[in-house]
Each structure stands twice: as C-alpha cells, then as structure tokens.
From Swiss-Prot:
Gene3D superfamilies: Aldolase class I. [4Fe-4S] cluster binds at residues 129, 133, 136. Signal peptide: none annotated. This is Uncharacterized protein MJ0674. Its cofactor is [4Fe-4S] cluster. InterPro entries: Aldolase_TIM, MJ0674-like, Pyrv-formate_lyase-activ_prd, rSAM. It holds the Pfam family Fer4_12. One of its GO terms (molecular function) is 4 iron, 4 sulfur cluster binding. It comes from Methanocaldococcus jannaschii (strain ATCC 43067 / DSM 2661 / JAL-1 / JCM 10045 / NBRC 100440).
Length: 338
C-alpha cells in the first residue's frame, strides 16, 4: 500500500526513520574532514534497511548515524551547498542567495489544511526561501529576506525547544511537517531538532526539492514522507517565474533519487502553463515514479508580483481545470486529495 509505512509510524506501529538513525552506531568521527565523514555516512547507509526495524530492535547508541548527519550539515553550513544555488558561503558570517544565516520561523501549529492523510499535521513554517517565486502565496514569510517592504515578524528558532514542542503536540498530530518558505536552508536546524526529539513521529519534508545531491543524502534515513512541490515542466519557466536555474533537470533528478521512498507530489496548475508544465510533469511522473501519489491543485490565484506577468495574471478557467484532470487520467496518476 502506498504511504503504508508512514501510516504505520503515524499510528506508532513502526519506528520513524530518525529514531532508527539514532540506533545505528557509526565509528568515531571527531576531527575528520568532510570527505571522510561522507565516506562513513554512505558506507553505513548502504547496509541499513529501514523497513526491517521494529521497536524491539531499538537502542540508542553514540555516536550514531543522526549525529553524523548533524556533523556533516555543520560542515556544509560553513561552505553552504544544501541547495543547487551552491553559494559556498560561510553562513555563520555571510549570506548567500537565500539571505538566511541562523534559522527563524514564522509559526507552528496543528494544520488541518494539508492532504487528508496528513492532518492534523504539526507544521513548522520556516522564514525565508531559496526561490523567488513571483506568484508565491506565502510571500509574507518566504520573501521576507528579499523584500524589505515586508514586515519581519520571524521568531528565532531553537532546535532543543522546538523538539519539546513537537513532543508535547504529538498526542494530537499525525506527523511533524517542516516547510517554509522552504526548509532546505534550515536543514542543519532540522537535523539538530530531530537529534533532541525522543518521541516517535513521522517526519514530512515539505519542499520545492531544489536540493543538491548532498542535501538529498542527508535526508535519506531521516524523512518518512517527501511532500514535494513540482512547479514547472521545463527550465525556462523555472528561471522566469522562480528565478532559479536548471529547475526541471534538478527536480527530476531529485525525484528519481527518492523513487523508492514514500512521496506525495503536489502540482499547482497555473493558467497558460498546461502544455509547457502540467503535461510535462505528469508524463515524467507516469514514466518514473510508481510509488508517488499526486495532488493536482487548482487554487492558484495571482498573488505577490504575479500581476506583472500577463500569462499568470488570472485564475484558472473551467476549461483549464477540466484539461488538467483529463491529463491526470491520461497519464494514469494515482491521485490524492486535500
């Protein structure tokens, strides 16, 4: 059954992957170079089958795989390449494309507006983003570091305190859902949070998926469900409307890296973009991602700077909605709904 493991973790019938990662011992890595850390990481990860663990197998050890991931993320943070902007700045003192140094968040709450299988979802909204989408509907938090006209009400993020909040709300939530903006620039903070968290809960990575391969490797063995936002079916639309290069190539690659994981793909249908984007995305999913379920979303409205772009300066027509549904049927997608 698709999403079967997630459902088991959500009901406390199976351990979350980050819990398992804390039970996988690694050799002492203090003082090692980044390439040496990766060598240990990849060697250990190849041997682990996360589906073969139950609660009887669990015993926390030190140092463990999650500790190692945190250490690798600390190294990357100082020469940042979590995402494909690959700024290579030391974020302790410098700002890259996303303008984010330490992590801030806007809010956290039990979200009832996600997909039915996810709610109630304990959703943590990080401030900032590695995209500059001209149509962003969460622009007040995603674009706060880019646009000085947006009031900044972001809250300093403390991983240890957030772990306590997640634990407290677990009785009422099916999962913890890291989103933004985008969570990618906050990957170090998220891994630290999970290292403090001792409550079994599925981890949802809710992202635009513009990560580097290195960023993707850090997520492997930690994330239970990838909730991905697949926006464009070509590189040109990605660069024009989200200001990122090689969009389609990178997002395809990253989805192929998680083709054996549990994945929910969201696609926001946009006016005038069914041929260039929607159909191309559906075709790719149909040919490559058997495990994925898809949420075709029709709630597009021209937000933020969309009025400056004539092709997306309106809502969808009935005909466009109907065509998108016909395409989903044509490509035999496994649909999921809000």
């Amino acid at each position: 059954m698709k999403l079967g493991r997630y459902l088991a973790v959500s009901k406390d019938l199976a351990p979350a992957k980050f819990i398992i990662a804390k039970c996988i011992e690694v050799e002492e890595f203090k003082g090692l170079e980044l390439n040496e850390l990766w060598e240990i990481h990849n060697k250990v990860l190849k041997k682990v089958d996360f589906d073969n663990f139950d609660f009887n197998d669990l015993e926390y050890v030190k140092p463990n795989l999650l500790d190692l991931k945190v250490e690798i993320a600390k190294n990357i943070f100082k020469n940042c390449h979590f995402c494909e902007h690959r700024c290579y700045v030391n974020r302790e003192t410098e700002r890259g494309f996303c303008r984010i140094k330490e992590s801030y968040y806007s809010t956290e709450f039990l979200h009832l507006g996600e997909e039915r299988v996810l709610v109630p979802s304990h959703t943590i909204f990080f401030c900032g983003c590695n995209f500059k989408c001209v149509f962003c509907q969460n622009w007040d938090i995603s674009q706060v570091y880019f646009d000085k006209t947006i009031p900044n009400h972001c809250i300093p993020y403390n991983p240890k305190e957030m772990a306590k909040i997640i634990k407290h709300k677990r009785d009422y939530s099916k999962n913890v859902n890291f989103v933004g903006g985008d969570p990618t620039p906050h990957l170090l903070s998220i891994l630290k949070t999970l290292s403090y968290l001792d409550k079994n809960i599925p981890v949802v990575w809710n992202s635009n998926m513009y990560l580097t391969v290195e960023g993707m490797h850090l997520l492997k063995g930690v994330v239970d469900v990838y909730l991905t936002d697949f926006k464009f079916g070509n590189n040109e639309c990605g660069e024009r409307l989200s200001k990122v290069k090689n969009y389609f190539d990178i997002i395809k690659r990253n989805h192929l890296l998680i083709k054996d994981e549990e994945v929910i793909i969201r696609h926001l249908v946009m006016p005038n973009h069914l041929d260039c984007c929607t159909e191309k995305i559906f075709d790719f999913i149909s040919k490559n991602l058997d495990n994925a379920v898809v949420n075709v979303m029709f709630q597009y409205r021209p937000e933020y700077k969309a009025k400056e772009y004539p092709d997306i300066n309106r809502r969808l027509t009935y005909e466009e909605i109907e065509k998108a549904l016909e395409l989903a049927e044509k490509y035999n997608l496994d649909l999921i709904y809000d």
